């Protein structure tokens, strides 16, 4: 008979079919499969932890978003936000669905070109565009969204040297009733900065003003803020037409739509309270249609939606390392998933689901990662069934920003797989190895040898 591990007795309330703070029962069903592929098989073949992305979910989200806007507005174009998730397989899925590329660095610009996106369908945002970046953008006829006057002056000289007309827009920041304002980017609407930049562009021979851009925040919960922003950009566009007899081609509303994830501190779950893509679509399109644009002169509407389209398409699989009690008696579960690969655990209360059958007794639990840092907390308090060492878990809705902001701190970054429309599993990024990391390092000759 196998010897059982001893755990000191502790009187602790267990919950079984008891109401939670919302007056409903905390009920769990094991998440044993993703897109009909068994979690245990995925971990057995690809290791733990493991990111799993659903191609079907990406395509469904993209088509739902397009339908929401195109049913309300005649000219709509999405541009995939590379910074949200720039795995090539993810980007190319969005491009197959018709999305352009939206990038914020020279590195991301090169990635979009490498993904076979035409330069004319790359939107170049961000405050840090080097002169080489600008030259490349001008050469590829990209849409350059100017962030500040220094960039404007540099771009004018570069376009003049190249004897080309740079296609430009300006980023406009504004008061939409959401605070703090994102006024560090772009030109302010209220104090006249936007018009100052527009007047300069209209005087330059080597620039053509093709659009107006804004990005009012991140994880936005107020569709009305987008209605205000759309109205102010429409007023700017109409003012340009009146002053210069020049019609812009598009209004770019940026991104920032909230996903269905649960923000820390929220009383109710995001799936019940966060606005839908239809809510955002209605706010933006109704404002533009009811503005003073002639019906046959409505500008193209561009959306740079990222998080809302990718968050719920990916799961992170992991394994229980151990359980223990803190000094105050609280139960803790330690996973092989750290904040170094689940960066969004700093601002989300991610849903954690066991991947196998379990007892229906639950207990409030602190979920930690494997890092030797006290900040490595995946969930500060979550009601979970009792799990044992070696059990598997699924952390849901991890598609946005984790695969771009992760780092190899203490542990290496894991493999990423994508399940295609037919249920086939593809490795889209290999797990890191020490040899791969050492390829980038150099040791000075005098440090190569030592004795201890």
Regions picked out by a protein language model, each given a short descriptive name:
Residues 58, 83, 105, 137, ...:
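Conserved, mostly hydrophobic/aromatic
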Residues 100, 123, 145, 169-171, ...:
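Structured core elements
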Residues 1-146, 152-165, 204, 208, ...:
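A charged N-terminal "starter" segment
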Residues 91, 114, 134-138, 155-158, ...:
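Short acidic, glycine/serine/threonine-rich loops at helix termini
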Residues 2-16, 176-319:
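Active-site loop/helix belt of alpha/beta enzymes
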Residues 81-87, 106-107, 127-129, 147-151, ...:
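Active-site beta-loop-alpha junctions enriched in small/polar residues
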Residues 283-452:
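Charged (often Lys/Glu-rich) extended helix/loop segments that serve as interaction or gating elements
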Residues 38, 54-57, 61, 65, ...:
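General structural feature for long, well-ordered alpha-helical segments within catalytic domains
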